[in-house]
UniProtKB/Swiss-Prot annotation:
GO molecular function: purine nucleoside transmembrane transporter activity; pyrimidine- and adenosine-specific:sodium symporter activity
Protein name: Sodium/nucleoside cotransporter 1
Domain of life of the source: Eukaryota
Name of the encoding gene: SLC28A1
Species of provenance: Oryctolagus cuniculus
Entry annotated with the keyword Coiled coil: no
Length: 658
């Protein structure tokens, strides 16, 4: 009884005082002294352990409350931080523009683009449903039909009037227009199903190409914008020298082609991989694809692949729609292949720019080729099957699989090595084969007393009429025809390298004709040639395309083989029609050189301006036997005309220099 009472007293005492009571006293007589000492020791031990924990909780209590407050108002803090960052950027942006607007032009353009994208996003988010309700009356089928007819009629009349007024000043542009008609008729004659051609798709594609070319080539704002964009791309690609010079040395980078141009492919591949990881490439591709799909009424998959070919190569673009390749119709496969042959990739674009090819023309040709490729592919191989991808919802593009930006950059650079090796190997092989073919043809020609027979000469004769229909002057046609033939039978790298050599000769002030041989082509011919060569349509690309697509869908190898030749031919014609559009729209740009002022000063180096001005002076100079020569036009009564003539005769040979 006493023991039970003692246990009860112990339990009550412990419960009432708690384990934090360090002076716990056990008064029950039933508990011996040893148990008492053990309990005292335990009580002191527990008290020593618990007191610091209690103080720690009291110290952490304000931090806990602060963390809870931050979590509760996280969205508010994010908005405040974002607002402060925007204010700081606005201050920096205004300061940069006020100090030197020309220097801050790139920042201004980027800022405007970001603001435009954000405005479109918020308009769609907050006003999208209202705009849809406002446009609901236009869903009436009869109203839409009348709108289409009026739009088509106005467009046709406007085109006819514009051509009539514009070609009155430059009749040679009509040749390029006739070239477009010629290529369209040839492609229609080669069509797989003539009765199934959707002319709406064809005319929309050609119309979009023409409108974009009009904005970029003819209008001053568009031309200046793309010229500026091309300059920025060149400046950006110049940073490749920092890496390649460190690894390879300045001497190799400056003097050797392989170390000068090929590292740009690695740098550009790295940048494209980063942009793909961030989702920027997918976003731009989807917007372009949506626009083409809505206007041209093509399916989601083929349109997405066509839009992707503006930025990536003919083997990378099908990866965007890889899960859907197995279900594509033959017409859709043909469209995917055609777009690959008709455009170039972003990485190769950088290499061509490093050759000295005009960057704005290359960018314009790539973008203009997308709607034209889609249109002509539907002309040559119209749709007769039922596609599974007619929905306007489109196809979702995945983000990059890399875990961070550094991995994306590393993978992009590593993947570009294979492309660099492929380009270098092809250049070595094709140039060697071309040299052998030329030697063999020259030997065969000499057997029958035909001197100088080469592959380029044969191409210059066979392709000369076609090149003339693009709008190239007849005197430039042999050289342009050579490059077109080289591009188709070898590859575009060799052709663009040849074009860059002609351009360098012109800019260096070399005489146009030497011993009856033309040394360079006109600026107009350079632009048309740049457009006509912009694409992967060559014989070697057949194997690359078939190999890439067959690895993705092996069971459709026979279908791929059926349409690849048609796609190659169609892709070539896309580039030729783009060249015709450039021939229609091209006008000389830049202020003409004031030759009187230019030659009034002493000059020691030859340039294109030197050649043009000296040629003008030669044309206005007349020999008077033993008397000093006389001058006409702007050179008449100029005291320095004789000195300028002497300077020009020091650089160029002419009959008036005798």
């Amino acid at each position: 009884m006493e023991k039970a009472s003692g246990r009860k007293s112990l339990a009550l005492s412990t419960a009432e005082n708690g384990i934090e009571n360090a002076g716990l006293e056990l008064t029950e007589e039933g508990i011996n002294s040893e148990q008492t000492r053990r309990m005292e020791v335990q009580g002191h031990s527990l008290s020593d352990d618990v007191r610091p924990a209690t103080h720690q909780r009291s110290y952490l209590q304000p931090l806990t409350k602060a963390r809870t407050f931050c979590q509760r108002h996280a969205s508010l803090f994010k908005k405040i931080l974002l607002g402060l960052l925007c204010l700081a950027y606005a201050a920096y942006f205004l300061a940069a523009c006020i100090l030197d607007f020309q220097r801050a032009l790139a920042l201004f353009v980027i800022t405007c683009l970001v603001i435009l994208v954000l405005l479109l996003h918020f308009l769609k988010k907050f006003l999208g449903k209202k705009l849809t309700r406002c446009l609901k009356p236009f869903k009436n089928s009869q109203l839409r039909l009348w709108i289409k007819r009026v739009f088509a009629g106005v467009s046709l009349v406007g085109l006819i009037l514009w051509l009539a007024l514009d070609t009155a000043q430059r009749p040679e542009q009509l040749i390029s227009f006739a070239g477009i008609c010629m290529f369209v008729l040839i492609l229609f004659a080669c069509s797989k199903h003539h009765s199934a051609v959707s002319w709406r798709t064809v005319f929309w594609g050609l119309g979009l190409q023409f409108v974009f070319g009009l904005l970029v080539i003819r209008t001053d704002p568009g031309f200046i914008a793309f010229q500026w964009l091309g300059d920025q791309v060149q400046i950006f690609l110049a940073y490749t020298v920092a890496g390649s010079s460190f690894v390879l040395g300045d001497t190799l980078v400056n003097d050797v082609f392989a170390f000068q141009s090929l590292p740009i492919i690695i740098f550009f591949g790295c940048v494209m991989s980063i942009l793909y990881y961030l989702g920027l490439v997918q976003w731009v591709v989807q917007k372009i694809a949506w626009f083409l799909q809505v206007t041209m009424r093509t399916t989601a998959t083929e349109t997405l692949a066509v839009a992707g070919n503006i930025f990536v190569g003919m083997t990378e673009a099908p990866l965007l729609i890889r899960p859907y390749l197995a279900d594509l119709t033959l017409s859709e496969i043909h469209a995917v292949m055609t777009s690959g042959f008709a455009t170039i990739s972003g990485t190769v674009l950088g290499a061509f720019i490093s050759f000295g090819i005009d960057a704005s023309s290359l960018i314009s040709a790539s973008v203009m080729g997308a709607p034209c490729a889609l249109a002509l592919s539907k002309l040559v191989y119209p749709e007769e099957e039922e596609s599974k991808f007619k929905s306007k919802e489109g196809v979702k593009l995945p983000r990059g699989k890399e875990s961070n930006v550094l991995e994306a950059a590393s993978n992009g650079a590593t993947d570009a090595i294979a492309l660099v090796a492929n380009v270098a190997a092809n250049l070595v092989a094709f140039l060697a084969v071309l040299a052998f073919i030329n030697a063999a043809l020259s030997w065969l020609g000499e057997l029958v007393d035909i001197q100088g027979l080469t592959f380029q000469v044969i191409c210059s004769y066979i392709l000369r009429p076609m090149v003339y229909m693009m709008g190239v002057e007849w005197t430039d046609c042999p050289m342009v025809a050579e490059m077109v033939g080289i591009k188709f039978f070898t590859n575009e790298f060799v052709a663009y390298q040849q074009l860059s050599q002609y351009k360098k000769k012109r800019l260096s002030g070399m005489e146009e004709w030497i011993d009856g041989q033309k040394q360079w082509i006109s600026v107009r011919a350079e632009v048309i040639t740049t457009f006509s060569l912009c694409g992967f349509a060559n014989l070697s690309s057949i194997g690359i395309t078939l190999g890439g697509l067959t690895s993705m869908v092996p069971h459709r190898k026979s279908d791929l083989s059926k349409v690849v030749i048609r796609a190659l031919f169609t892709g070539s014609c896309v580039s030729f029609i783009s060249a015709c559009v450039a021939g229609i729209l091209y006008v000389p740009r830049g202020a003409e050189t004031d030759c009187v002022s230019f030659l009034s000063t002493s000059f020691t180096n030859r340039s294109y301006e030197t050649y043009v001005c000296c040629r003008e002076l030669f044309q206005n100079t007349y020999l008077n036997g033993t008397n000093p020569p006389s001058f006409s036009g702007a050179w008449e009564d100029k005291a320095f005309s004789a000195m300028a003539l002497a300077n020009c005769c020091g650089f160029y040979n002419n009959t008036v220099c005798a």
